[in-house]
Amino acid sequence: KRARPVIAWANALGHDTSRIMQVRLVKGAYWDSEIKHAQERGLTDFPLFTRKPATDVSYLACAKDMFEAAKIRPAFATHNALTVATILQWAGDNRDFEFQRLHGMGEGLFERLVREEGYQCRTYAPVGGHRDLLAYLVRRLLENGANSSFVHQLADQSISEDELLADPVEKIMAVGGTRHPAIAAPADLFQPERTNSLGVDLDDALILKETATEIAL
């Protein structure tokens, strides 16, 4: 949810320092842990969307912001064919950006774009022993094993092409909102027995400042 303000901040920083920075746009990798973190800490709300189509729309909105940011060189990390097609449509003749994919995934999607069309694609490959890679592999299993994952749906023969490539905006409108009713908000985690205790998100600079001010009083 905070991605668009971060993009605006990064672009402003580039203007202030007369530098162009590459910004990587990614989604989904830490979704489960972010949900659990917010519930355990009793935060006022989730820092991300609880419906997959809402995340897809947010990603595209951020992609558009990055194309319009003069001091940002976009790097789009995705295996979603609809997202890739949308980005290519918006880019037009602009080639000053790159795609990114995980090692072992997305070869078929990006092979033609790289070899025949000349687009850039960076491959993210894990390095290290099995102990170092275990957390990475678990995140990939959670991400790609989810029913809402594009990679998972692509392998599901029961899902039609039209359904796979449906407009995420239309999906949100069809379900009536961006919040998933089956995912309890942090305050409602223990309902109906009781309300969850309210935590303080010290990662939020504004909340940290307010907390420090109250302590000083």
List each language-model region with its residue ranges.
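Non-catalytic terminal/interface segments that mediate subunit docking, oligomerization
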Residues: 192-217
